[in-house]
Amino acid sequence: MAKALPIMFQGTHSDAGKSVIATAFCRMFAQDGWKTAPFKSQNMSLNSYVTPDGNEIGRAQGIQAEAAGVAARAEMNPILIKPSREHESQIVVLGKPYGNMQAFAYRNEFFHQGLAVIRQSLETLMNEYDRIVIEGAGSPAEVNLNDRELVNMRIARLANAPVVLIGDIERGGVFASLVGTLSLLEPEDRKRVIGVIINKFRGDVALLKPGLDWFEQHTGVPVLGVVPYLPDLAIDAEDSLSLERFASSVGGEEAIDVAVIRCPKIANFTDIDPLLAEPDCRVRLVTHGDELGAPDVIVLPGSKNTIEDLIYMKKRGLASRIVSLVNEGKARVVGLCGGYQMLGAVIRDPYGVETPLPEVKGLGLLPIETTLERTKITIRTEGMLTWAGERFSVQGYEIHMGRSAPLPGYAPLIEADGRHEGAKHSDERVLGTYMHDLFHNDAFRTAFFNNIRRQKGIAPSGVRLFRSLKEKAFDRLAAHVRQHVAVERIEQMMRQFGCRDHS
């Protein structure tokens, strides 16, 4: 595996900030003129990304490719694990569904096949790019799993990559977690760790210096940076833990109240990220009918198990409350992918794709019926959306196992590639579509919320370009990390490491 110089970021635990730091390095290397590819051998996430050629990968690697200024491709995340029901996940290999497997079977039956796919993907990228930014998962010190792990030190050895270990100081105990992780590594793996980064720091770094000095003396591993917490970073999150940033959103008395229904199998929740671009929107997550109130907008996001989440909504009083609010003319509803299916008359599952139940009654707010099928659709979508007497050019992507058919009274929401996509209620207060990234389309999003603003007596807003905000966020993140991390030292260590003999 020659040509590219790799660097790998591993964490002491999940959500330590590996994805964000890796994104920063993708951007920095691209800014410095290097053709850069992100790589994560195996990703477990319900947030996915469709590549230009219709393959499904983890959302983080798609965003990292954007940061690097290159087209995302399946080799950047050759294995994607999407939890679908208790102890079972859908396995996506090189962008296409492989099948559903339980955790024990995956670990014992898929290991060698998975490793072969990972090796080939990594070789392809190493031969075509200058820099490879590799992201691990969880912790490299999971001693009960390390004999068959496919995402941390085994990948570092495969790529002959130096490793930077990331610790999250926000959670507390950062030195214990860093030292503990290092102590649990095999000696040859510990030699790969060229340094650590302490992430999400708040306060005066001078107060941290005695701890940094102690750590370096105790472990012999250098601290390569202390990265202060960076608020309001408009970059898609991957981990559902990141949804909590919406729970604390606040707004004034005139704010537009947006309630996002948070079900257990919520997927592709990055669909709601552009709402952060609307300064007068208060976005809150709702899990029970009693919490719903009377919002201006209700968003039903995607789901990895639509039927189970629909049953969850019914049991918690959400379904009946949503229907009542619509019938009373008090709320607008937008359903995305699985949320779109829920808005229809019925969801049928003749092949047991999601549950043993043959069918479940939907909310009945859109004239469609859905049948879940074994074949997954993953495509990029472009078309014209018609709403409130206006037509908007929109683009996004679709990832779904079901197909929805129109019933009497059906009106399409989008005309895409010669077909009708999505649906809308006769009064246009209920919209549904399979197309993710609906709110990423700036003109439509602005018109949608300006309609609400006018009804609430709020001045209309100008168009805010979410893609521009994302590009600025990439640059802001890169500048932030350059300021607080010894980037040049890391690059020097990468070159030195590549010259070593690790056979």
From Swiss-Prot:
Pathway: Cofactor biosynthesis; adenosylcobalamin biosynthesis. Keywords: Cobalamin biosynthesis, Glutamine amidotransferase. InterPro entries: Class_I_gatase-like, CobQ/CobB/MinD/ParA_Nub-bd_dom, CobQ_GATase1, CobQ_N, CobQ_synth, GATase_3, P-loop_NTPase. The active site is at residues 337, 436. Residues 255-444 form the GATase cobBQ-type domain. It holds the Pfam family CbiA. PROSITE patterns: GATASE_COBBQ (PS51274). One of its GO terms (molecular function) is ABC-type vitamin B12 transporter activity. Catalyzes amidations at positions B, D, E, and G on adenosylcobyrinic A,C-diamide. NH(2) groups are provided by glutamine, and one molecule of ATP is hydrogenolyzed for each amidation. Belongs to the CobB/CobQ family. CobQ subfamily. This is Cobyric acid synthase. It comes from Geobacillus kaustophilus (strain HTA426). The lineage of its organism: Bacteria, Bacillati, Bacillota, Bacilli, Bacillales. The gene is cobQ.
